[in-house]
Amino acid sequence: MGIHVPSNVPMESTPFKGMEFEADEIACGFYNEHGKKAGFSIKKEYVNKYKKTGVVTSRRFVCAKEGVRGKDKRNQNVKNPRAKTRCGCEARLVIVLNRDSKKYVVSEFIVEHNHYLHLPSTVHMMPSQRKAATTHAIEIDLAHESGLRLKQSYELLSKQVGGYDNLGFTK
């Protein structure tokens, strides 16, 4: 499959070694936005914290296709086995707390992916990009309480916002 490097991402949206963030969640949001523009989904892999204070000292964000799924312990003759979603991708962003400045600094950034990246037209379907707005969730609940089926309320809401890709979530 080869190595795939995002080429359509502006430099100001690309993290780099030594880049600083005020908080770990800001770094997560920045890397998630980078992933959206590049065509991949992210996940939080691990976090290290001070035991006494609970302050995050380091954190790793990885491509959602990082690692490989373990052997399925269920019956081997299942009709619909789960699709393989992970392929051992090494792309990641690691941040470490600088004790002097109290800021999080990028200590490692690997940009290369070992899988194809998503097209801009399908980016909104990736797990880290799907965010249901509170107002949308309330509207779907109200429609369900009014007797509409979930699919019908989803279609109604998608028409209100101008299409499925503007919703930010799937059924």
Q: Can you describe what each PLM-predicted range is?
A:
Residues M1-P127:
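Short, conserved DNA-binding cores of transcription-related domains
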Residues L117-K171:
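Short, positively charged, Gly/Tyr-enriched micro-motifs
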